[in-house]
Amino acid sequence: MSVDIHSEKILILDFGSQYTQLIARRVREAHVYCELHPFDLELAAIRSFAPSGIILSGGPKSVYEEGAPAVAEELFELGVPVLGICYGMQLMSRHFGGEVVPAGKREFGHAELLAQGTPGPLFDGFFLDGKSPVWMSHGDHVSQVPEGFQVAAGTANAPVCAIQNLACNLYGVQFHPEVNHTPRGEQLIDTFVRKICGCSGKWTPGQIIEDAVARIKQQVGSDRVILGLSGGVDSSVAAALIHRAIGEQLTCVFVDNGLLRLGEGDQVMATFAQNLGVKVIRVDAEDRFLSALAGVSDPEKKRKIIGGLFVEIFEEESNKITDARWLAQGTIYPDVIESAGAKTGKAHNIKSHHNVGGLPEHMKLKLLEPLRELFKDEVRAIGEELGLPHQMVWRHPFPGPGLGVRILGEVRKDYADILRQADAIYIEELYAADHYHKISQAFAVFLPVKSVGVMGDGRTYEYVVALRAVETKDFMTAGWYPLPYEDLARISSRIINEVKGINRVVYDISSKPPATIEWE
């Protein structure tokens, strides 16, 4: 008997916080389905959604500002548990008659939370010896708690940092439990969705696959599907999932655009022939892509050109396939987050994504995106459940535009050849030194600037390569990976000696934010 994986669900209302998608990630980690919607979702839509619980996100506004974001008045009367985070807690407090004022001292960063009174079930196991480290990011605070609420915790600078109304199952926290900097925050969100909201945890890899297979069959019917295969985790898992659902109705098109990693084209063909048994058509399109990118240096324009040309080629290939009606993509949730504000339109558009931008308005193929609601590690878990090779599943993310956004400025064939070699050496050394699987994403970047060097008795004037390696749990925030100096020295020496055209290697130690993981 199939399980309805959507029967238990959490509604997350987005007030514009950069961390909102992390809340969804933590709910998913508790094996509970959730959806993210704008804060002004109508009450009728909320009732129709029938959430097991509601989470109100943080946001950049102040609740006492004119036109400040607010929720439907009756939301708190629906009888479902509500957790307000940061702005969400302030909104809840003000709604019930509490007071919110500008803080005398703003809190940003680490803080020590101190338990007060008798913290309710939300805080089971959250405090050790009455204390818990948390991450703060607020300029306002609750100065007077509403009637019916009790203070559960505070800090030296803000006496009211957690509130609770046990009779109504309403909770608020001023800190951010969704970020990694709050060590036991993940546990707190798990407690909310599992213990307080009563969700049992039906959102598991096996059940997600079963549900996705059924949905794909229903959506596609007897139509044929064409999928753009890159060899990366997302398109590989999408191919395996769709193939399980519709078998020979799927044809994968592997576009060799001249912007892939060293030897990647041959590896992709060999891997899928051996492991998936999927029909794959290889298209050599290097000249078309490099010609289209000639003279283009703006990263957004490059992304649009690459995305548009991919779709154009897919359409050409689909015309050769009888009854091809669908274009499948490996779009995942973080792609949608960065490009479209997670469907809310409330988040700032940092950069367009290859899978969700650059599509022609009158595309002849309908889009099939079976992974678009999944985070990266959910995709990996599904890939393993589907039996894909471990090395394929755990390969670092590679952008859809490929080396096109790892070559700063104009893309040229000689630049791509240099970068391919440098990147291959870098990744090879990370494997050899047992760093690769400890790093979330690592790659080389080609900088189209020259610097003076000395090799032998001669002067050189050659290009620069930057190395990037980051650690992250969710790709929403990331820290740079501290490679040992001796490893950096060895990698640099190999690249400079083995790659013609490079005489300088630098290491990127920027975190996200303020920098993004990719340079473009």
Curated annotation (Swiss-Prot):
It is an enzyme of class 6 (ligase). Its EC number is 6.3.5.2. Pfam families: GATase, GMP_synt_C, NAD_synthase. Residues 203-395 form the GMPS ATP-PPase domain. InterPro entries: Class_I_gatase-like, GATASE, GMP_synth_C, GMP_synth_GATase, GMP_synthase, GMPS_ATP_PPase_dom, NAD/GMP_synthase, Rossmann-like_a/b/a_fold. The active site is at 86 (nucleophile), 176, 178. ATP binds at residues 230-236. Residues 9-202 form the Glutamine amidotransferase type-1 domain. The keyword Signal does not apply. It catalyses: XMP + L-glutamine + ATP + H2O = GMP + L-glutamate + AMP + diphosphate + 2 H(+). Keywords: ATP-binding, Glutamine amidotransferase, GMP biosynthesis, Ligase, Nucleotide-binding, Purine biosynthesis. GO terms for cellular component: cytosol. One of its GO terms (molecular function) is GMP synthase activity. It comes from the Bacteria. Pathway: Purine metabolism; GMP biosynthesis; GMP from XMP (L-Gln route): step 1/1. PANTHER family: GMP SYNTHASE [GLUTAMINE-HYDROLYZING], GMP SYNTHASE-RELATED. Homodimer. NCBIfam families: guaA_Cterm, guaA_Nterm, PRK00074.1. Catalyzes the synthesis of GMP from XMP. This is GMP synthase [glutamine-hydrolyzing]. The lineage of its organism: Bacteria, Pseudomonadati, Thermodesulfobacteriota, Desulfuromonadia, Geobacterales.
